[in-house]
C-alpha cells in the first residue's frame, strides 16, 4: 500500500531540470523512453510523481544514474563541470511527451 501525497507543482518543477537531447536519446524516443536531468538528491518515486503530474502521462519504468563530473580546461586552468543525475523514463504505450515545439 503506497501513499501518494499531493505536492505543489512548483516543488515538482524543481525536481526536473531539463530534458537531455542527444543523438542517442532521440533514438530512444522512438522506443517511448525519455531522458531528463533531475535533482541529484531526487529519488525514483518523486521523479515518477513529478513526470506524471507535469506531463500528464503514466510511467512504466525509471532508471537513474549519476553522471560524474567532467574535466573542463580553460587555458592553463583545469576545472570541472558539475555532476548531475540522469533519469531515463519509459512510458506506457499510448502516452507521449512532446519535447519539440510545433510551429
From Swiss-Prot:
Where is this protein found?
A: Plastid, Chloroplast
Q: What does this protein do?
A: Binds to 23S rRNA.
UniProt superkingdom: Eukaryota
Question: So what family is this one in?
Answer: Belongs to the universal ribosomal protein uL23 family.
UniProt protein name:
Large ribosomal subunit protein uL23c
Please classify the protein's predominant subcellular localization into one broad category: plastid
| Record keyword rRNA-binding present | yes
GO CC annotation: what is one?
ribonucleoprotein complex
How does this polypeptide assemble, per the annotation? Part of the 50S ribosomal subunit.
What is the source species? Gracilaria tenuistipitata var. liui
| Keyword GTP-binding recorded | no
Show the InterPro entries listed in the entry: Nucleotide-bd_a/b_plait_sf (IPR012677), Ribosomal_uL23-like (IPR013025), Ribosomal_uL23/eL15/eS24_sf (IPR012678)
Keywords on this record? Chloroplast, Plastid, Ribonucleoprotein, Ribosomal protein, RNA-binding, rRNA-binding
Amino acid at each position: 500500500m503506497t501513499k501518494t501525497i499531493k505536492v505543489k507543482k512548483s516543488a515538482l518543477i524543481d525536481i526536473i531540470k531539463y530534458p537531455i537531447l542527444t543523438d542517442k536519446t532521440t533514438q530512444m524516443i522512438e522506443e517511448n523512453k525519455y531522458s531528463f536531468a533531475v535533482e541529484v538528491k531526487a529519488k525514483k518515486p518523486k521523479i515518477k510523481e513529478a513526470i506524471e503530474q507535469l506531463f500528464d502521462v503514466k510511467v512504466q519504468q525509471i532508471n537513474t544514474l549519476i553522471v560524474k563530473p567532467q574535466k573542463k580546461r580553460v587555458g592553463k586552468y583545469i576545472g570541472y563541470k558539475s555532476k548531475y543525475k540522469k533519469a531515463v523514463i519509459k512510458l506506457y504505450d499510448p502516452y507521449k511527451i512532446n519535447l519539440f515545439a510545433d510551429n
